Amino acid sequence: MIIKKIIDYFEKKYRAQKYWEKKGLKCGASCEIYEGASFGSEPYLITLGNHVRVNTGVFFVTHDGGTWVLRGLNNNQYKDIDLFGTINVGDNVHIGTNAIIMPGVNIGNNCIIGCGAIVTHDIPDNCIAAGVPARVIESIDQYSEKHKESFLHTKLLTSTEKKEYLLNLRKK
């Protein structure tokens, strides 16, 4: 029992995707799940498309905890109730640090969810959503157009080359 807990701890920390897939998460190809992301108590109700990045501290919530109060009412009418919702994330999606995705939400393809956003409603394809509650703030095309002059081509650099490049930018 203790050995299993130790293995689970290290697997969750260093091999998050494999850990959550064992628990039932459906995950497409080329996904990145960062340490500290949580798929809650029902990861089998969550589907991630291809090329999805889930950052540190992201929470997927598949149930409504408010039923706890109803179960506590004296009439016993609700003593065994729960309320669940699936969560579906499309292809090519980035979910920012500490975002919360609530039950029943569908996030479309080619979306960015901002850091700290609380997503309570569906997000359509090709959108950026942020805020509490999350709302669409612009399209992917608008984002690309707005930042195209600022994009830096650093993904093919080594970490040393990238550091040197970025530090030289600061000097200009």
What are these regions (language model features)?
Residues 29, 90-91, 106-110, 123-127:
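Structural motif
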Residues 63, 122, 146:
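Residues that scaffold the ATP/ADP-binding catalytic core of kinase and kinase-like folds
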Residues 34-106, 132-133, 139-141:
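Flexible, glycine/small-residue-enriched loop-and-beta-strand segment within the central core
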Residues 31-33, 113:
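Hydrophobic, membrane-inserted alpha-helices
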Residues 122-126, 153-156:
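Short arginine-rich
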Residues 118-120, 128, 136:
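Conserved hydrophobic/aromatic beta-strand scaffold that supports enzyme active sites
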Residues 1-24, 29-30, 66-67, 132-172:
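Terminal amphipathic alpha-helical/low-complexity segments used for targeting or macromolecular assembly
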Residues 97-112, 117-121:
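Beta-rich strand-turn-strand
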